[in-house]
A protein has these predicted regions:
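Sec-dependent signal peptide recognition
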Residues: 2-9
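Rhodanese-like catalytic fold shared by cysteine-dependent sulfurtransferases
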Residues: 4, 19-44, 51, 55-56, ...
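Hydrophobic h-region of N-terminal signal peptides that target proteins for export
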Residues: 10-18
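Thiol-based oxidoreductase modules, predominantly thioredoxin-like and allied folds used
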Residues: 76-81, 168, 187, 192-206
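Short cysteine clusters
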Residues: 101, 173-176
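Short pre-active-site segment immediately N-terminal to redox-active cysteine/selenocysteine motifs
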Residues: 161-162, 169-172, 215
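Typically the conserved alpha-helix immediately C-terminal to a functionally engaged Cys/Sec
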Residues: 175-190
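A cytosolic small-molecule/anion-sensing beta-strand core signal
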Residues: 223
Length: 247
């Protein structure tokens, strides 16, 4: 009997610790202040969104980004525009709000503001719109987007040279911008034979889906059409060249 009581006490302690850990995982600290973590994986975001007859979907990117591609039924809302507050006032506080941006910076900023205003349920797509596109979920894309590439043509490009480095990213993604000087430095060198290709995720959802890209920047080095190296984040020239030399 005594052993059973001890076992029950231990079990309750474990459950309490686990529960505490789960609660802590939903809280972020910024400048010493606690903020709720609204980040939601694409699958859950998609599932919760589909439960709504008239979902409140907010695109926290710029108007230019929104015009290139956006989630169906999404409303573009930019903190930089004059009628920003008026747009928020049109939302129903008791209904879930679904937010996304190129990553989670701008969408989290809006989410925190909504939370301060008393909105009850908020979801932020993480790690950004690339996760939605990579999962193959619906996306409305401008047919006039000059950065759009036909999937079959892209696959042909991968075999057009022995080494092809593909940079999956976006002009609006801060870390992606840091990749550009790396590629410029790579292209300025004459001691390698690596062709670079840039793929804008917003303009090429079919490519992003087919190659299962869910985070940006993502760089993949191909040799004769086959992937031999992958980097999520900002690489160095040495990493890229080193990956080709190892083959």
């Amino acid at each position: 009997m005594k052993k059973q009581i001890i076992f029950i006490i231990i079990l309750l302690v474990i459950i309490a610790i686990d529960s505490k850990g789960q609660n802590q995982s939903s809280v972020l600290k910024k400048d010493g202040m606690e903020q709720k973590d609204f980040r939601t994986k694409a699958a859950v975001f998609h599932e919760k969104l589909n439960e709504q007859l008239k979902p409140q979907i907010l695109d926290a990117r710029s108007e230019e980004e929104f015009d290139q591609a956006h989630l169906p039924q999404a409303i573009q809302i930019d903190p930089a525009v004059e009628d920003y507050d008026r747009q928020l006032d049109r939302l129903i506080k008791s209904e879930p709000v679904f937010l996304y941006s190129i990553q989670t910076g701008r969408s989290t900023q809006v989410a925190n503001l909504l939370a301060e205003r008393g909105f009850e349920t908020i979801y932020v797509l993480a790690p950004g719109i690339s996760a939605w596109i990579g999962a193959g979920y619906p996306l409305e894309v401008s047919v006039q987007n000059k950065n759009r590439i036909v999937l079959d043509d892209f696959k042909t490009t991968l075999k057009s040279q022995e080494y092809v480095l593909v940079d999956f990213g976006s002009n609006y993604c801060p870390p992606c911008k840091k990749v550009i000087p790396v590629l410029d430095s790579l292209n300025s060198r004459s001691n390698h034979n690596i062709k670079t290709v840039l793929i804008e995720i917003d303009a090429n959802p079919d490519i992003i889906k087919d190659f299962k890209i869910t985070s940006i920047p993502t760089l993949i080095l191909y040799k004769d059409g086959e992937p031999i190296w992958k980097k999520i984040g900002v690489p160095t020239v040495e990493e890229i060249v080193g990956a080709s030399v190892k083959q």
